[in-house]
Amino acid sequence: MNNEQNMTQNIDQTTQTAAEQATAAQTAAEQKLAKKKLTRRIFIGGSLGALAVVGGGAGWAYNRYLAEHTEIEDTTAYEAAAQQANASASGSTTADPTELTGVKVNGQSLTANEGSITITSTTTGSGSDAVVSFVADIKLDNATLLRSAFANNKFGQNIIDTPSNIASEHNGIWAINGDYYGFRTTGIVIRNGVVYRDSGAREGLAFYRDGSVKLYDETATNAQTLVNEGVWNTLSFGPALVKDSAVVDGIDSVEVDTNFGNHSIQGNQPRTGVGVLGTNHLVFIVV
């Protein structure tokens, strides 16, 4: 994916939050902005959603798909220690910026000294056929202002929460759900420049410290190499819809997640996408 002026979109194939939850989370965020009860951070969520279990083997299914399995109890402390170690290894003495300053709100738009956020919404159809989409156009001076946070500040499997709660707990001014890492045991998971999982399995999306964003093959690299190359966050999801300003060949025949624990989400289901318009210029959509 070209990071200059080329749109690349990835769609979260495992978003399980209901449409009304996504709408409610976005509405709550807008209300907070309108009241100017502002916090200062922008977040991509960790593990979000509701799981459905069907069929027999209830004990096994509960343990695999519902029971929490915590690998890291305090991700904030874990990241602080890892970032300090990385800084010592690289000899860097410059801290990454983490907060917006000089925040001003006008309707659904926000401006700050370090960038801007503009939110728009569109409704098509009516009644039970109504589809609501929210689009956030985000411009930042520094890519590290876009941070990740985990549900309950833990890393593991089946640890869930809503985007609004995660944002509130981490002083987020805007938030969106992430790649649903917690349902899987595979994928490369890098958050805020720190490695959490290194088990390449699929196509991923890498957000770099320099503001560029690239699609990549997880099986052709490893997490530490990506961090050394300047990756700040990764999303292990897909499929890619647009690459180098063109629709990806065969996208209309790609089957989206159909496994036992995570029921099929083919057809009309809540979706989350991200697009890249240029360096440090991103667009996020929730439908």
Regions found by a protein language model. Give the residues of each.
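N-terminal targeting leaders characterized by basic, low-complexity, disordered sequences
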Residues: 1-28
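Zymogen propeptides
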Residues: 2-3, 25-35, 40-204, 212-215
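Generic structural motif
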Residues: 138-143, 210, 244-246, 279
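Short, solvent-exposed aromatic-acidic interface loops
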Residues: 151-155, 220-223, 287
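Short coil/turn connectors at secondary-structure junctions
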Residues: 170-171, 201-202, 210, 236-237, ...
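Structural recognition of the beta-strand scaffold that forms the well-ordered cores
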Residues: 173-177, 206, 275, 283-285
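Active-site-adjacent helix-turn-beta-strand microarchitecture at beta-sheet edges
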Residues: 181-259, 263-265
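Domain-core and long-helix interface of multi-subunit machines
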Residues: 252-287
